[in-house]
């Protein structure tokens, strides 16, 4: 990584794992897309190429990624629905060349060496942390650095630097009246199916007691 598509119009950086990438790959191959490796990154990249931002509705996994869409001159980034993989961002009015920009990464320390990153303590983030002993807000201890919430995506218009953040998934907590035994059977089925989906790997899978 970074990985680009065939004409170089899309470039992706990706951290995580897409559990259903093989199904996505088969669907995309049927549409004429060519694959050059067995990585889930390529399925994600071509998925965006085909479905745009709606690719998020098809993903199953843990992920944080950003795609540079050169044709639309924008960035598109997203985080998985449970927030397993982190994604931090730092909007800049001046990225050093007089134009706006944004830093992004899975760790804040990747920002530290950038010459136009302003290192300052965010005092507003200290109070909730001292109270709850974990960071409960989108703000971080660095002023101006934020974490993208779970189940959210952002777009950045590169010429203007305008950033838009949207939620793409939410849980439905509506109660459904069913016999207790039916709930047990459904839960058992979901757990087994989830474990099976997580077993996809390039090496043998083991479990530690």
Locations of regions flagged by a protein language model:
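Cysteine-centered catalytic environments shared across enzyme families
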Residues: 1-209
